[in-house]
Regions:
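N-terminal hydrophobic or amphipathic helices and topogenic motifs
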Residues: 332-393, 414-417
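A ligand-binding cleft/hinge motif common to bilobed small-molecule-binding domains
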Residues: 388-389, 400-412
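Conserved small/polar residues in nucleotide/adenosyl-binding loops
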Residues: 428-430
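Glycine-rich loop at the start of a catalytic domain that most often binds anionic cofactors/ligands
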Residues: 49-64, 374-376, 394, 410-416
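Polyanion/phosphate-binding surface patch
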Residues: 39-71, 119, 426
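Acidic, His- and aromatic-enriched active-site or binding-groove loops in soluble protein domains
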Residues: 59-68, 173-193
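Paired acidic/hydrophobic, glycine-rich loop segments that form the ligand-binding mouth/hinge
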Residues: 380, 397-402
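Positively charged, Gly/Ser-enriched RNA/tRNA-binding surfaces
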Residues: 16-34, 45-48, 78-92, 97-152, ...
Length: 430
């Protein structure tokens, strides 16, 4: 018998535990200095109670208690804080500022069972205050906390969901089409956004064009005005003035070089109503933290209050800090690494890479080689179904696979472009 931990769980030995303790102390002291008070929420929640607050990540552990209630181990803390405020603090004037450091439990993506299913979430929630000042406060606090956690030099990508929601509402789109567009934005699947807003779009062309263009807008403070020019003729500037003011406040706080306005940022949680933001580090392929404004969520449980907050993964922040300690020169010298599929997709893939100007020597007949190294690029030869996992886990910078493999993997990757080859013929035998 192998005496091992369950998949997605691990032991933490003394050296790492001491580092976690130090980070927790420094970050919590930072939050406390801003007036945030500690809270704790239960590990288990009634499933229907969590669902009432909006879409959430899946919990890997669900079971019935003796009363017949379906319970789940918490996948997120924000929903619990909203429930607590609406029930335990009903009638109290506020505002409230809360901080926490708690374990959360997430389902592994697709077949990636080695992925962590237990992680430590550090965050704050500012309850009862609205407007740019409160939004800037939580963004600034996240930047400061990540610095203290060792994830220095992170970039914060900001947007506001109000513009997209206003475009969808004004377009006259059906509820089904609106849900499809929102799902594509939440998944950062802009190939799907392009398809939905193409020639057969279910909305007037001017709205389809605006929705299609929105996630391509990114940059500094000037990007806000680019969005305004896009949506003002359609009367869809919802939340843009507040967002612009928030960006100005962050610049005044000295964060101008850390902030990126990026309207492709739309959280996978559907409960956000205003500003949304994500923290990125060059050492990590996925966001290490995110947050935003969720003014409607507390009202789902009772008394409505405006609210904003953020959370980040302690483990991911530590991974960024460890990666940053490695030689910058070694990382800069590493070539682009692409996961290339074997089999029927190989010939078209080689042609596409050649058209992009890459050296594909040896790629058309790799034999038993697993890695082909050419000037400026490395090719990792994989099964088509494995390409998403290689990218998600950092073994490749990008990859090529079929749409079916991408959907089946359910990995945290972004579909950049449809290469328009490899379509399969489906046969039904009767």
């Amino acid at each position: 018998m192998d005496y091992v931990t369950p998949a997605g769980f691990r032991d933490v030995l003394s050296d790492e535990a001491c580092m976690r303790e130090r980070i927790a102390r420094d970050v919590q002291a930072c939050f406390a200095a801003r007036g945030y008070l500690p809270i704790e929420t239960p590990t288990l929640e009634v499933m229907d109670v969590m669902r009432a607050g909006g879409r959430m990540p899946g919990s890997p552990f669900k079971f019935f208690d003796a009363s017949g209630d379906l319970l789940a181990m918490r996948p997120d803390v924000t929903l619990q804080v909203a429930r607590m405020c609406a029930t335990r603090l009903a009638g109290q004037p506020g505002p409230f500022r809360f901080r926490y450091m708690q374990r959360v439990f997430r389902e592994a993506e697709g077949r990636m069972q080695a992925q962590a299913r237990e992680m430590t979430q550090i965050g704050v929630e500012c309850i009862g205050e609205a407007g740019p000042q409160a939004d800037a406060e939580v963004v600034e606090l996240m930047a400061e906390a990540l610095e203290l956690a060792g994830a220095r030099g992170c970039k914060l990508a900001l947007a506001t969901v109000g513009v997209l929601r206003a475009l969808l509402a004004a377009s006259g789109a059906s509820a089904q089409w609106t849900e499809q567009v929102l799902a594509a934005f939440h998944a950062s699947n802009f190939v799907e956004v392009d398809r939905l807003t193409g020639e057969a779009a279910a909305v007037p062309p001017v709205f389809a064009a605006a929705i299609r263009a929105l996630p391509r807008i990114r940059g500094g403070r000037e990007a806000v005005e680019e969005v305004r020019a896009l949506v003002a003729p359609l009367g869809c500037e919802d939340g843009l003035d507040d967002f612009a003011r928030t960006c100005d406040l962050l610049a005044e706080a000295g964060l101008a070089d850390r902030i990126l306005v990026d309207f492709s940022v739309m959280s996978s949680f559907d409960y956000y109503t205003g500003i949304v933001f994500e923290a990125y580090a060059p050492e990590l392929g996925t966001p290490l933290g995110s947050g935003g404004r969720y003014d409607n969520m507390i009202g789902s449980y009772g008394e409505s209050r405006p609210a904003a907050g953020f959370a980040f993964s302690l483990e991911q922040a530590m991974a960024v800090a460890a990666a940053a300690d490695r030689s910058v020169d070694d990382e800069a010298a590493r070539p682009l690494r692409i996961a290339v599929p074997k089999g029927s997709l190989n010939a078209d893939t080689v042609a596409a890479l050649e058209a992009a100007g890459l050296d594909t020597t040896g790629l058309d007949d790799p034999g038993r080689q697993l890695i082909i190294r050419n000037p400026g690029v490395e090719y990792v030869i994989v099964r088509p179904t494995d390409a998403p996992a290689f990218v998600s886990l950092g073994a490749a910078d990008c990859g090529i696979c079929g749409k079916d493999s991408l959907l089946e993997a359910q990995s945290d990757v972004v579909e950049l472009v449809d290469l328009a080859y490899g379509a399969c013929l489906s046969l039904i035998h009767i």
